[in-house]
A protein has these predicted regions:
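Catalytic core and acceptor-binding pocket of nucleotide-sugar-dependent glycosyltransferases
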Residues: 174-225
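N-terminal anchoring/stem segment of glycosyltransferases
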Residues: 27-106, 119-120, 174
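Residues that flank catalytic or metal-binding motifs in active/ligand-binding sites
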Residues: 46, 77, 93, 110, ...
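GT-A fold catalytic core of metal-dependent nucleotide-sugar glycosyltransferases
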Residues: 89-92, 97-99, 111-162, 172
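Short, hydrophobic beta-strand segments that form beta-sheet elements in well-ordered domains
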Residues: 77-86, 124-125, 148-151, 212
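A short acidic, often aromatic-flanked loop/helix-cap motif at beta-alpha or helix-coil junctions
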Residues: 89-91, 102-107, 156-158, 218-224
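A residue-level signal for conserved active-site and pocket-lining positions in enzyme catalytic cores
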Residues: 81, 114, 130, 170, ...
Length: 225
């Protein structure tokens, strides 16, 4: 495992990261002796996941593979790569494929990633395929570990107090935001008429379970900032 640059973290963040790594090591040791009857959720051990979504032809499998390679270079926490897609051709063999339900289109595929019925168990760090990773991302897993996290929409560059979310990076526990999916799929057309896109819907659907926002300086837009 690569050495972590301690200078990237505050004192409190470093304590959280050390605790996270210690817990991960203990969990890995536990998993080696765990009997099937002791695995309580879905029969799956808990993992950290990097998730992306590829639908249609806007982004090729190369984008998925490049994102995977970027995470390998810049993450020292054990993870599994997951891609939600309607076409798995060309993906790296280490990437776990989850098929998208039929009928979803464009950014309205995104609510599916919050479903509790995905065949995974643990913590998901979702990234859009146009995200470029420039530094270590361990703290995206360790920041505010008891909450779900996302970033402020990049309208913040023009309106500093802008409260709405940008769904290009979201971290959550599997099943934690299941209602974002179930409330959407109950009447997709009604949601689409009222909300411009998936991140507007995410903001509305989680009003009673608001996100902790990553610091603006951690994730920035090359276009707006």
């Amino acid at each position: 495992m690569a050495k972590i640059d301690k200078s990237l973290y505050t004192k409190d963040e470093w304590k959280v990261l050390k605790a996270q790594r210690k817990a991960n090591k203990a969990q890995r040791n536990l998993n080696t002796t765990l009997q099937p009857s002791q695995v309580l959720v879905k029969g799956l051990e808990e993992k950290n996941y990097i998730m992306c979504l590829k639908h249609g032809t806007k982004y090729s499998s190369d984008y998925v593979n490049k994102l995977y390679n970027g995470v390998l270079r810049h993450c020292t926490i054990d993870f599994e790569m997951v891609c939600l897609t309607d076409d798995p051709r060309g993906l790296h063999p280490n990437i776990k494929v989850i098929s998208l339900p039929a009928g979803l289109q464009g950014w309205w595929c995104k609510p599916y990633m919050y479903s509790k019925d995905l065949p995974i168990n643990g913590v998901v760090l979702y990234m859009d395929l146009d995200v470029v990773i420039a530094a270590n991302i361990d703290k995206l897993f360790s920041y505010q570990p008891d909450n779900w996290c996302t970033i402020r929409d990049f309208t913040r560059a023009m309106r500093p107090k802008w409260p709405k979310y940008n769904s290009s990076i979201v971290r959550f526990k599997v099943g934690q935001l299941d209602s974002v999916w179930t409330d959407y799929i109950r009447d997709p057309k009604a949601v689409q008429r009222k909300h411009f896109g998936d991140q507007d819907w995410l903001f509305e659907a989680t009003r009673q379970q608001q996100a902790m926002l990553y610091p603006d300086s951690w994730i920035q837009s090359w276009k707006w900032e």
